[in-house]
Amino acid sequence: MKNSIKVERAIHSLTQEQLAQKLGVSRQTIHTIEANKYVPSTVLALKLAQLFNKQVGEIFRLDEED
């Protein structure tokens, strides 16, 4: 699964730490999601979409391998 969190974060001028604080997670969680090493829970994916005013499918997309 690929995501555009890093791009959205840059658009909103947020650091990983700032985004993590807004979502109530660690900076490491944001880092691993951005690196496509961790797939977030449904709740966290929805929170990200809401924060960035996007649909979940606009932020997360399936890879051919998925």
Which sequence ranges carry the predicted segments?
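Short basic helix-loop element that most often maps to the first helix and adjoining turn
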Residues: N3-K22
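Residues in the helix-turn-helix
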Residues: Q18, T29, E58
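Recognition helix of helix-turn-helix/homeodomain-like DNA-binding domains
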Residues: V25-Y38
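DNA major-groove recognition helix of helix-turn-helix/homeodomain DNA-binding modules
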Residues: V43-E58
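Short, charged recognition helix plus adjacent turn
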Residues: F60-D66
